[in-house]
Amino acid sequence: MDHLPVRSITAMQDYIETHLHEPITLHQLAKVSGYSPYHAAHLFKQALGISPLTYWRKCRLSAAALELRDAQDPILSIALEYQFDSHECFTRAFASQFGLSPSTYRKLSPPIPIFRPFRYGPNRPQGVASMTKTTPIFIQLIQRPARACIVRRAKTATEYFQYCDEVGCDVWGVLGSVKEALGEPMGLWLPEAFRPQGTSKYVQGVEVPLDYQKPLPEGYELMKLPAQTFMVFQGEPYNDECFGDAIEALQTAIKAYDPAVVGYRKDPNGPCFQLEPRGERGYIEAIAVTKNKN
C-alpha cells in the first residue's frame, strides 16, 4: 500500500482524533485530505480497513469508555459529550462494541477491547533514508517488585508482527482498559520458565497488583512475576514513519552493550519487555539484569 497518499490519510486520522466531541462529515474530511468526499472515504478504507465514520465512532466510544471508568460524570453527560443523541443511543452503541452496558462497565470496569487508533504509514516509505547515524541512548536501572501480569499468549510468535498474525491486533486495547494496571501495556519476551509448553516466547501483557481478582476475558491469564531489576534503554525521539529503523537501531545497541560496565549482567531467567513505539518519546526496551557478585 506504499502508493497510497500517507499524508492525506494521516491528516484525516488527526482530524477525527481531535474532533471527538464534534459532528464530523465526509466533506470536512475531504477538505483536510485534499480529495473529493468519495475518494477520501475510499482511500481511508483502503488504507485502514474501515470507513472514516466507523473509525470516528470507535474512537468516540473508546474515549467515552475510559471517561466512564475514570470520571464520575453522569452517563448521559458523557454520551452527549461524545455526540450521541440520547442515553439509549449511547447504550446500544456501547453494548454493540463492548458487549456490556455503560452502567455495567462503570460498576465492574472489566477489561474491554478499547479501540486504539493506529497510525497509517509504511515502515520505511520510499524516499526516507534509514537511520544510520549514531544517536544517544538513555539507560537506567529500575526495580520492579513482585507483581502479576495479565497476558495473552500466542503459540509460536517471537515478535510483534508474528504475534498480531496469530492473535490479532486488539489485545493492546484490552490491556489498556485495565483500571488497576501498574503501568502501560507492553510486549514481553518470556524465558522458558514462564512459558507453558506450546506457547510463544513473545506475548503482550500489562502488570497489575498481586491481589488482582477480576474476571479475565477469554484467552487471557494471570501470570505472577517475581521482583526483578531491569536495565531500560530509551532511544531519541523519531519520525513515526521510521519506527522500524528506530526499533532496529536500539535493539542493535542493546545487543552490543555490556551491563558489566555498571556492575550487572544479563539475567536469562527474567523477561524482557518493550513499550509501545511512540515517536515523541523514542523507542523503549528493557532487559532483565542481576547484580554481579564481587
PLM regions with names:
Residues 1-10:
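Short, charge-enriched, intrinsically disordered boundary segments that mark the beginning
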Residues 10, 14-27, 46-82, 108-129:
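Terminal helix-turn-helix DNA-binding modules in bacterial transcription factors
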Residues 1, 42-48:
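Short, Lys/Arg-enriched N-terminal segment that forms or immediately precedes the first helix
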Residues 69, 88, 92-294:
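A solvent-exposed interaction/effector surface
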Residues 25-44, 70-106:
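Sequence-specific DNA-binding recognition helix
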